[in-house]
Amino acid sequence: DMAAECKLARETGYLAYKTKGRPWFDIHEQLRQSCAVVPEAFKIDMDFNDTLLDAERALPILRELEKHPQVDIYETPIPQSDIAGNRLIREHTRVAIAMHYRKPPPSIQVREGICDGFVIGGGASALMRSGAFAAEASMPFWLQVTGSAITAAWSLHFGGVLSHAIWPAVDCHQLFKEQLLTQPIV
């Protein structure tokens, strides 16, 4: 239940929550319930994994969801290869659009104005290269490096040195029963 997860996230100190926008859930009702239990300052990011198919179908849904002030980022609402469609979505929503780094190439993403920032993951060298490009392009991003609390601690170091890693990070360490650290990440 998304509302319970948002409430728990806020109670444990998180300022944002990332969820999957999926057609088998009533996303409008889930969002309504979630926004009722968290303040406007708490942000909800929605990852559609291109399930909204194209801009014509996506925009009515996205425009309705953006009425909730908590909605802050849409990740990949339609296929990233649809440059014209993504540009249209970006131009017609107040919500930031995030795209996975490298598809299409980030220079095209920036030049064509199809996103507001990136989802960046990978190993140490890739993170540093991608983060440097994002800084040069003045594009924010979130680090998406998932694993145990050890991985989360490793990712936190990159978040501390990459100037544009300012969107909420995704590391998923909370899903592990054993954290593998002697002191928890707070």
What residue spans do the PLM features occupy?
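Shared catalytic-loop signature of beta/alpha-barrel
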Residues: 63, 70-73, 81-96, 101-186
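Metal-dependent enolase-superfamily TIM-barrel catalytic cores that perform enediolate-based chemistry
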Residues: 1-89, 93
